From Swiss-Prot:
Family: Belongs to the RbfA family.
UniProt name for this protein: Ribosome-binding factor A
Organism of origin: Rickettsia conorii (strain ATCC VR-613 / Malish 7)
S-adenosyl-L-methionine found in the keyword field: no
Taxonomic path: Bacteria, Pseudomonadati, Pseudomonadota, Alphaproteobacteria, Rickettsiales
Quaternary structure and interacting proteins, as annotated: Monomer. Binds 30S ribosomal subunits, but not 50S ribosomal subunits or 70S ribosomes.
GO terms of molecular function: ribosomal small subunit binding
Any one Gene Ontology cellular component term annotated for this protein: cytosol
HAMAP family assigned to the protein according to its UniProt record, in alphabetical order: RbfA
Keywords, ordered alphabetically: Cytoplasm, Ribosome biogenesis
One example of a Gene Ontology biological process annotation: maturation of SSU-rRNA
Taxonomy, superkingdom: Bacteria
Its biological purpose: One of several proteins that assist in the late maturation steps of the functional core of the 30S ribosomal subunit. Associates with free 30S ribosomal subunits (but not with 30S subunits that are part of 70S ribosomes or polysomes). Required for efficient processing of 16S rRNA. May interact with the 5'-terminal helix region of 16S rRNA.
Xref: InterPro entries: KH_dom-like_a/b, RbfA, RbfA_dom_sf, Ribosome-bd_factorA_CS
Cellular compartment(s): Cytoplasm
Gene: rbfA
Amino acid sequence: MKKLTKTHSHRQQKLASIINEALIEILRRGKMLDSRLFDCPLTITKVIVTADLKIANCYFLPFNTKLTIDEIMDALNNSKNAIRNFITNKINMKFSPDIRFHYDHGFDNAIKVAHLLKDL
């Protein structure tokens, strides 16, 4: 029987934690980033690293910004090399995982569910 939930190894969890902390630090500093990110407060909601440790999926949520999600994604992708270099300096591995950014729909989904429950 297949497990319903995915389990993550200790290495995956540790690497995800390091990447999360590094992302928070580089976003706070703002150095080497796309200028559109300077006035765009972001929250990194979670980081999920694949089993082979080659891809880090980073989920974010913007707050009080005039930028669209597409503009934020474009700015993050333009800054991806600088972010990856910063993370490479933080980890002690042969390679640095590829960073992929995703908008976190979790809060939007929670609001939709709350509205549906309210309408019952």
